[in-house]
């Protein structure tokens, strides 16, 4: 089941972020501040369903009473200075135990939230991914199936 997150979900959502981190390219060199994760998620859940700058959508995938995935999206001013808003994803993560369609269903929930907001134009709804987690190409294909197109690249400095 996909649903909006509640405050009681935060401890498990912190664990999900830690699981994502452990599978990421950052795991060997960057630790996780559970306090920062908790604070971030608490703020996001507080603003869950918001329709103004800083508003969020926080969705979870739940199976047999256990959270197996999360999605966090946020509203910001277009180009950070615009008089309209854009929707951006912050986190999308599902465990191997999640349902096959959970990621897709959480994205659908994000799109419904963004599309219902008259301050957000359709072309200002964004989805992103990087090579931080394995399976990036699969995520890109899912986004394309949802009607999204590539809109640039992210570059990072090479380690020395």
Where are these regions (language model features)?
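A short beta-loop-alpha structural element at the N-terminal edge
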Residues: 1-15
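Conserved GNAT-fold acetyl-CoA-binding loop/helix
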Residues: 21-43
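A short helix-loop-beta-strand connector motif used in the catalytic cores of GNAT acetyltransferases and
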Residues: 39-60
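Conserved beta-strand in the GNAT
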Residues: 60, 66-75
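A conserved beta-turn-beta hairpin within the catalytic core of GNAT-like acetyltransferases
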Residues: 78-89, 151
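A short, internal acetyl-CoA/4′-phosphopantetheine-binding micro-motif in the GNAT/acyltransferase core
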Residues: 90-102
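Conserved acetyl-CoA-binding loop-helix of GNAT-fold acetyltransferases
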Residues: 99-115
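Conserved beta-strand-loop-alpha-helix junction that forms the acyl-donor binding cleft
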Residues: 123-138, 159
């Amino acid at each position: 089941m996909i649903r909006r997150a509640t405050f009681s979900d935060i401890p498990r959502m912190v664990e999900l972020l830690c699981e994502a981190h452990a599978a990421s390219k950052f795991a060997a060199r960057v630790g996780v501040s559970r306090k920062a994760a908790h604070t971030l998620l608490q703020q996001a859940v507080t603003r869950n369903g918001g329709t103004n700058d800083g508003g969020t959508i926080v969705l979870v995938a739940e199976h047999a009473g256990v959270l197996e995935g999360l999605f966090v999206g946020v509203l910001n001013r277009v180009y950070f200075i615009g008089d309209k808003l854009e929707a951006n994803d912050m986190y999308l993560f599902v465990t191997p135990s999640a349902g096959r369609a959970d990621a897709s269903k959480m994205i659908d929930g994000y799109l419904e939230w963004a599309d219902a907001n008259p301050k957000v134009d359709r072309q200002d709804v964004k989805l992103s991914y990087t090579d931080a987690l394995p399976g990036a190409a699969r995520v890109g294909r899912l986004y394309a199936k949802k009607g999204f197109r590539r809109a640039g690249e992210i570059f990072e400095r090479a380690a020395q």
